């Protein structure tokens, strides 16, 4: 899966995110639930968007590589 494909998928699903969640929380949980690679990106690749929304694109780039 390409970064662009994954980003489009996640951004489409983000319309359904709980209002109390930040975008990074949603992205992390969505990737973890659907693809089970979020923790590998967080701990092995050292990219965490759960606590920092500025890392969303970089997180998705690393996740896309792991999903391929």
Q: Could you describe each region identified by the protein language model?
A:
Residues 18-53:
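Acidic, low-complexity, intrinsically disordered interaction modules
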Residues 51-68:
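Charged low-complexity stretches with an acidic bias
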